[in-house]
C-alpha cells in the first residue's frame, strides 16, 4: 500500500555515498523516517525535498520499517528564513524540539500545524522569539507540563501583580509571593503576555512588538522552565544561544 502525506523535514542523515534518511513530521501519520535514494546526487529529484524545514507532499510505500521515498512535491522551503542566519538558527531549534519531543508514528495534526504555522509566521516576519515562546508553551501544554499562567498556582487569584515561580510551576500572587524567594516579579502586561502566548494561535497574535528587555526576561523564564520540566537538552538551542550572544556583543 502506498501512503501520501504532507510533511515537514525535521532532519536528514547521509546514508552511503548518495542516499539520505529523512525524518519527517507528517500531518497524517506523525513522525516517521523514509529513505531518499540518490538524494545527495547533483540534480536529484529528491534534493530540494530533503532539506531541513522544507514542507512537501511525500509518497512512499507503507512499512513498519524504513519506507523508500517514491516522489516528493515541494510546497515551500521558507525562503526568507533561509536568507537569514539568525532565523535559520531559530528554525533549526524548532525542528529539533519537534524531533526530540514527539513520538514516532503517532498522528498529531494539531502539533503539525503548530510547527508549520510557527515557521510560516517567522517567514512572514513575526518576531522569532515570539514564535519560539508560543511553540514552547503550546508544546508544553500538549506534553502535560505547561506552566500555570491563568492565576496564582496556590490560591487561583487572578489579581495582579504576579511573580513567576519555577518551583511552583507558574504564577504566584502578591499574597503567596513569599513562598518562593527565587520567584521572578512580573508586570501585569508581561504576565498577560505569557498567558496569551500559551493559548492563542498565530492567526490571533497578529503583529506583536515586544521590548528587548521583556524578551530577555521571558527567555530567562522559558529556558529555566524547559530545562526543569521537559528534560530536553538540545544542541540547536546551544547554537542559537551562542549566535544570539555574538549578536549582542
From Swiss-Prot:
GO CC, sorted alphabetically, is:
bacterial nucleoid
Keyword annotations for this protein, in alphabetical order, are: DNA damage, DNA recombination, DNA repair
- The domain of life is Bacteria
Pfam families, per the entry: RecO_C, RecO_N
Alphabetized SUPFAM superfamilies for the sequence: ArfGap/RecO-like zinc finger, Nucleic acid-binding proteins
Q: Name one GO biological process term.
A: DNA recombination
Q: Matching InterPro entries, A to Z?
A: ARFGAP/RecO, DNA_rep/recomb_RecO_N, NA-bd_OB-fold, RecO, RecO_C
Protein task: Involved in DNA repair and RecF pathway recombination.
Q: Which family does it belong to?
A: Belongs to the RecO family.
Q: What is this protein called?
A: DNA repair protein RecO
Which species expresses this protein natively?
Exiguobacterium sibiricum (strain DSM 17290 / CCUG 55495 / CIP 109462 / JCM 13490 / 255-15)
